[in-house]
Amino acid sequence: MRVLNLSSNDYANYAHDNARALRAIGVDCRDATINAHPFGYVTQSQVVTANQIITTYKQYDCIQIFHSDTNLYNLVKDHPNIVVYHTGTRFRQQSEFYRNAFPNAKHATDQCEFLINYPDLFYIAPHTELKPVEKAKDGKLIIGHYPSNSDVKGTKQIKEMLMPFDNDFDIRIDTRQLLHKDNLARVAECHIYVELFATEQNGKPYGCFGTSAFEATALGCLVITNNINEKAYTDVYGHQSFLTPNTVKAFQNTIFGLADRDTFDMTVEAMHTGFYSKHGIIETGQRIKQIIER
C-alpha cells in the first residue's frame, strides 16, 4: 500500500507525524506540503508544488488531506480513496461547510469537540516518542504555560486564575515563539503544564487538548487542559491522562489540590498510567491504517 499525505501548512507537524506513524508499521507513506513549517521542526514534510502533486498523486493507493484543505482536495478529488483530517480553527468556524466540501471522502479528526455534532468522524489522537525528563525535587513545583497562540489558548484568563497561587508555585508564562526543540526544553522543566483554558472560540465550542498536551505528558509533566467531550477520547483510548477542568472554579480547585507535593506525585502516577502504551508511534500507525482501509 502506498499513501500520500498532503498539507498546505502542516499545523503542529500533524501530517508529517501521521506519515511517520504509518511508516513505523511498514506502510509506504510519503508526506508533502506546500509551505515549510515556521517552528523549525527537526523533521517535517517535503516542500512541493501543486503541479508536482497533480503529476504524481495517482501513483498512490490512498491520499490523506490535512487541515480541511479544499484547495488540495480539488487537485486530487477524482482519486477513489481519500481521507480528510479536520484539525482546528478552519473546521471549527465553518463545520457544516467543510463537512460537506469533500464528496466521497472519509473524515477523521484529532479534536474531541468535533464529535459532539459529527459523531461519525474517526477519532485519532496524536502520538509521541518523547521520554520523561526528571524534574527538580526541591523548591516549588513549576507551573508552565507556553502557548503557540495566546488568544486561542486563553492565556489572559490562565494568568488571572493562577495569580492567587503565586506564593505556592513557581509560575512561568511566556508567549515568545521558540523553535520546537527549544520549546520542548522549557516544557520539560515543568512539573505542571497548563496547555489550554478556552471552552469557546469565536462563539463556537472549543476546549480540546492538542499535540502539546501529549508532548508535555510524555515529558513527565502533569497536564491541565480542556476537553468538553471526554467521551470521544475514552471510547477509543480509555482513561484520559490529562486533568481537564472546564470552569474557573474547577481549575482553581485543581491547582489548590496540587500544592502538596505528595498529592502531586500520586496524581501524576495515577494520570500517566497507560499513556505511553496507548500513544506510541506503532499504536497510532495501526489506528491510522484502520481508516485508510475502511
Question: Model-found features: residue ranges?
Answer:
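A charged, aromatic-enriched C-terminal amphipathic alpha-helix characteristic of glycosyltransferases
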Residues: N13, D262-E293
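Extended catalytic core of nucleotide-activated donor transferases of GT-like folds
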Residues: T33-A105, T109, E113
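Short hydrophobic beta-strand element within catalytic cores of glycosyltransferases
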Residues: A218, L222-N226
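Conserved donor-binding/catalytic core segment of Leloir-type glycosyltransferases
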Residues: L4, P132-K153, K159
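Nucleotide-sugar-dependent
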Residues: L196-A213, T225-V236
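Acidic anion/phosphate-binding donor-loop and adjacent secondary structure
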Residues: Q94, I116-K140
